[in-house]
Amino acid sequence: RSGNAETLDRHAKPHWELAEEMDLIDFELGAKVTGAGFPFYKGKGAKLQRGLIQFFLQKADEAGYTEYIPPLMINAESGFGTGQLPDKEGQMYHVTADDLYLIPTAEVPATNIFRDVLLQENDLPKTLTAYTPCFRREAGSYGAHVRGLNRLHQFDKVEILRVEHPSKSYEALDGMVEHVKSILEELKLPYRILKLCTGDLGFTSALTYDFEVFST
């Protein structure tokens, strides 16, 4: 499925060229200060980033999601609780002195709110949203030569999460897909939705849809 294809300029410049020309993002400065995959957002680029985060959070609030600001680090028990450990341990930043991990997505601490908690059916659904910086090592050769904002080691993300009765889980997923679609439609961004094949599914996933938004 796709949408807003009519807004796509076939001769559009890559986003990294636009970011440089408009002085929105400085990739070289990030590489100097930290390393590749840690860009600086500046001026209007920083304002745009902050504005989009607030826009996404506001849309989630209007849809009934409760906002959380979770910790940016988790313990090993939380990593195992959502399947990041041991499956993706090599992709996570590990602070060995304290045996804590930087989160790869807000989903991890948000989901662990309900770890070891017995929920009654009439307590459901639980709907959460959270904005956090996210950290991923992206170890290995895959994505090593991509440019711009792809495969970053640090990036910002607004997450939506629903805890549902198993019999309603796929229906809930469809509702979340429609929520994201409505935001992209409002922003008039060209996008497509991919249903991942079994071999590409995450360790803990039964069904995954990827949204791809045009950026060249």
What are these regions (language model features)?
Residues 4-216:
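TRNA-recognition modules of translation machinery and tRNA-sensing kinases, especially anticodon-binding
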